[in-house]
From Swiss-Prot:
It is a multi-pass membrane protein. The keyword Transcription does not apply. The lineage of its organism: Archaea, Methanobacteriati, Methanobacteriota, Methanomada group, Methanococci. This is Uncharacterized protein MJ0880. To M.jannaschii MJ0871, MJ1556 and MJ1589. It is found in: Cell membrane. The keyword Cytoplasm does not apply. It comes from Methanocaldococcus jannaschii (strain ATCC 43067 / DSM 2661 / JAL-1 / JCM 10045 / NBRC 100440) (Methanococcus jannaschii). Pfam families: Gate. Keywords: Cell membrane, Membrane, Transmembrane, Transmembrane helix.
Length: 308
């Protein structure tokens, strides 16, 4: 594979995708998508404060956590309600911050429409399954309550020069993180393939990966994913183009990489955030949310192995 034309194409398309996504966010179009999460919030049988914090997660997970913490400290919600809200919270985060703003455009551009859409869909399904667990628990064990939320959305879609400039500036912040990772890992993986070190990697990890029907070289995707998910996408695409991975294997290794990324995020950021907002109770929240998230991803991997 000729690396320079490939790298140029990926950088160009990634830049266009991220920029367009950032501009779309600034037009207020994303606010219309909140209607996707509202029905789920309304049937969750949670108090209005929990629903409001869930909608905050659509904007940013830190916003949602901070709002929920405030309601908890004011005794407006109890521990069980906070736990269930935390379990449901990844869904609006996935739909809002992860998928529509960054993950979807990058996955489609780098992995292609078919593989990119399937992988992003698996992430969305993961969020829905986790939310379903929380919703079922709340409806079975919580007393039925009446929830009233204003569903009228008066925000208008705006598209002008100011919106374009603002979206472009936000895209630059994202691209400053994404582009270097794509370049570094594209060159690194290409170098390893040419050097033959992939054979060494294959020998070291083939026993474990054989169980999952993965080649030993797939470990490079996991390593790249530790730096940034876009680097993981790029590595997968390179391995597919070099005949190392097929689509099924690519999806499995991407989900494994997702588990590793989630683990690192929790170790680096989430646990500290939960504890700082909720005290000792925050550690319990982090452990519960992480455990359910990983278990669902493992389930999806097993389903891929069995049926894809």
């Amino acid at each position: 594979m000729d690396i320079l034309p490939y790298l140029t194409k990926i950088i160009l398309l990634s830049s266009i995708g991220i920029t367009i996504a950032s501009i779309i966010v600034e037009t207020n179009l994303i606010s219309k998508i909140k209607k996707i999460t509202k029905p789920i919030c309304l049937i969750s049988n949670l108090p209005e404060e929990c629903v409001v914090s869930l909608l905050g997660n659509f904007i940013n997970p830190t916003v949602g956590k901070s709002m929920l913490s405030g309601f908890y400290k004011e005794n407006k919600v109890n521990e069980k309600e906070v736990i269930v809200t935390t379990i449901i919270s990844p869904l609006p985060t996935i739909l809002g911050e992860s998928v529509f703003r960054v993950q979807l455009p990058l996955a489609v551009v780098i992995l292609g429409y078919k593989l990119g859409l399937i992988y992003v869909s698996l992430n969305v399904i993961s969020g829905f399954l986790q939310a379903l667990i929380g919703i079922l628990y709340a409806n079975i064990f919580f007393e039925r309550r009446q929830i009233n939320i204003d569903n009228n959305n008066n925000e208008k879609i705006v598209f002008n020069r100011e919106v374009i400039i603002k979206g472009f500036k936000k895209s630059l912040k994202i691209l400053k993180k994404v582009i270097p990772m794509i370049v570094i890992f594209t060159l690194l993986i290409n170098f390893l393939i040419k050097l033959g070190l992939m054979d060494v990697v294959k020998g070291l990890f083939s026993p474990i990966f054989r169980i999952l029907d993965l080649p030993g070289e797939a470990i490079t995707v996991l390593i790249a994913n530790l730096a940034h998910f876009s680097a993981g996408y790029t590595t997968v695409d390179i391995l597919i183009k070099n005949g190392v991975l097929n689509e099924k294997q690519a999806l499995i290794v991407l989900l494994i990489g997702n588990i590793i990324s989630v683990t690192m995020i929790y170790l680096k950021h989430s646990i500290g955030t939960y504890i700082s907002l909720f005290g000792r109770f925050g550690l319990k929240l982090a452990v519960i949310n992480y455990t359910i998230s990983v278990m669902i991803k493992i389930l999806l991997i097993l389903l891929l192995i069995a049926f894809f």
